[in-house]
Regions:
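NAD(P)+-binding Rossmann beta1-loop-alpha1 motif at the extreme N-terminus of oxidoreductases
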Residues: 1-51
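Residues at the starts of beta-strands that form the adenosine-phosphate
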Residues: 2, 25, 105, 125, ...
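Short phosphate-binding/catalytic loops that engage adenosine nucleotides
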Residues: 24, 43, 124, 179, ...
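Rossmann-like NAD(P)(H) cofactor-binding subdomain of soluble oxidoreductases
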Residues: 52-143
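Helix-loop-beta segment of a Rossmann-like dinucleotide-binding subdomain
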Residues: 93-100, 143-158, 202-209, 260-268
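Rossmann-fold dinucleotide-binding core
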Residues: 111-200
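Active-site-proximal catalytic alpha-helix in oxidoreductases
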Residues: 187-227, 250-259
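NAD(P)-dependent Rossmann-like dehydrogenase/reductase catalytic/cofactor-binding core
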Residues: 217-327
Length: 327
């Protein structure tokens, strides 16, 4: 199996390097200064038990030659970049005829729950991955992975439901690469549970580590309410904690704890976009569809957009301004 990791950031970089270390044919897809750095000196994965540098093929797109028929595509870009990535790869030719969208399995190792339906519009064979993987990408050519003793837990299964041999094959490869990789026929139930956990990402990006507990619980409560109204099943915190146990903890790397989650990292890098529209915004969307008020999530969504627009540094959005958005 050949893996193409579309988005070699925190999650994609960790998965790609670990698969490459275990002998798999891996191609990393990146852009800008990060791609330049990977091409020049490889991708360095910093972790609690030491650093390693992967050197292999890196690209910014599918190119002109056909993809091998045994290729597995793993989509790891942020949700706001999904449509562009899908469009770029869907029509890539495959050895033996047909296109990537027609013939190749696509795995979505991303936060949020909107990526899988978007992928299924173009790709015939879509598989979801629920990602619990504490990692950070702030510097070109470098990813810091704090997960220990395993780098992450990756539940995977077919979208919208079920599981098949390709799930089991990819899970075996991920397990050999050090991950905990359960195959689940209800992977979206896990992804909706992870969505609830990710609703605090925007708060952390705005306020840093000093997020009021009541505000964090408020955005989650709104999320639980809209999922209940929509009849969407999800895992709860107790089930998730029991599943992870002590398999994926956090350890310092180079004496430093993980700085912040995925949305915080987007603001810290000055990325110009963040995934709050697909996290808090998903709750807002479901609330509007099912008549459930979601003012806290709407405020976080708007706050992140404002922080991006005004180039507010990560963690430095005024609490008073967020309170005003909350009304």
């Amino acid at each position: 199996v050949r893996y193409v990791i579309i988005g070699a950031g925190a999650v994609g970089g960790t998965i790609g390097v670990r698969l490459g270390e275990t002998g798999h044919d891996v191609t990393l897809v990146a852009r800008g200064a990060h791609l330049d750095a990977i091409r020049r000196r490889g991708l360095t994965l910093r972790r609690p038990d030491g650093d390693t540098t992967w050197r292999g093929p890196a690209t910014d797109g599918p190119g002109t030659g056909p993809l091998p028929a045994d290729t597995v595509l793993v989509l790891t870009v942020k949700s706001q970049d999904t449509d562009a990535a899908l469009a770029a790869w869907a029509d890539a030719p495959v050895v033996g005829g047909g296109t990537a969208a027609q013939r190749l399995p696509l795995f979505t190792a991303q936060n949020g729950v909107a990526n899988e339906p978007a992928a299924l519009r173009l790709f015939a064979d879509v598989h979801g991955i629920c990602v619990w993987l504490p990692a950070t990408h702030l510097e070109p050519g470098v990813v810091v992975a704090n997960g220990y003793p395993h780098p992450g837990m990756l539940h995977l299964g077919r979208f919208p439901s079920g599981a098949d041999d390709i799930d089991r094959s990819v899970a075996a490869d991920l397990t050999a690469a050090g991950f905990v990789a359960p195959v689940r026929a209800d992977v979206m139930r896990w992804k909706y549970g992870k969505l609830l956990a990710n609703l605090g990402n925007g708060l952390q990006a705005l306020l840093g580590r000093d997020v009021p507990d009541d505000l964090r619980e408020r955005v989650r409560a709104e999320g639980e309410a809209v999922l209940a109204a929509a009849g969407i099943p999800h895992t709860d915190r107790a089930e998730e904690a029991a599943e992870r146990g002590d398999l994926v903890g956090h350890r310092p790397v180079g004496g430093a704890e993980r700085a912040g989650g995925s949305t915080w990292q987007s603001l810290a890098r000055g990325a110009g976009s963040a995934e709050a529209d697909h996290l808090n915004g998903e709750v807002v969307l479901l609330g509007r569809l099912h008549g459930v008020p979601t003012p806290a999530n709407a405020a976080v969504q708007l706050g992140v957009r404002r922080a991006l627009r005004d180039r507010v540094p990560a963690g430095e959005f005024p609490l008073a301004e967020l309170a005003a958005l909350l009304g």
